[in-house]
Amino acid sequence: MSAKLTIGFLGAGKMATALAKGFIHANLADADQIIASDPIDAARSAFAREAGAKTTASNLEALKFAGVLLLAVKPDQVADVLKEVGGEFTEKQLLISIAAGVTLARLEGGLGSGARVIRVMPNTPALVGASATAYALGKNATVEDGRLAQKLFSAIGVAFQLKESLLDAVTGLSGSGPAYVYLIIEALSDGGVAAGLPRDVATKLTAQTVLGSAKMALETGLHPGALKDMVTSPGGTTIEGLHELEKAGVRGALMNAVRAATEKSKKLGQGQ
């Protein structure tokens, strides 16, 4: 690599581990250029085992090691962590936060004037290198900081730079979205079992159907409605199934789920 990128994770959970593995796999950092801090022994052990990187129980040790800090703790832990590291954070460092609902203003306020901050919303498919990520730059973050965020999070999926005002919607859609999809997979699999299929076959058929459908949507660029029509023959089986879904209000329920999760994200950002 042309420049040594040192990365410190404040929090060593599953998402931090997935990110570290993605960065290493994409040759954005070597394992010895990464450190993760966490008070929980088991979390540190898992991070070290899976990412091959060093760990510590001290947030300040991670802070002093890294040029780029990834804040990967739960939202209700952010204030305490910022209070601990804020006095030692320098303008030469960049903080990237993946804490859901925690605003740039709160992050910048906790680190002091001049802090370079980026707020990021990945999702759990980062664990398999297939995250849908959006990020917003803080007022002091540079264009180069934005390029770095794009490079880092493209290593684990796709990434989009947006205005911060849209990140709550991202949380409601792609942040919470995997859970909606898993519920759909479970329900379709149950339907397959009810129709006589073995559970393992029904689940694998369903998951592959979702995967293949998503791949077609991404690779063809066609509107989902057009792709739906490609499957739907006049008077056939698919239109009967779609009719039942429409009668049950599935479309509206999914839209409402995104709206509800978006509003919850806004409340989290306000400390509610």
Descriptions of predicted regions:
Residues 2, 207-272:
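NAD(P)-dependent Rossmann-like dehydrogenase/reductase catalytic/cofactor-binding core
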Residues 106-116, 132-170, 182-219:
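Internal alpha-helical scaffold of NAD(P)-dependent oxidoreductase catalytic cores
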Residues 1-57, 61, 130-131, 193-195:
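NAD(P)+-binding Rossmann beta1-loop-alpha1 motif at the extreme N-terminus of oxidoreductases
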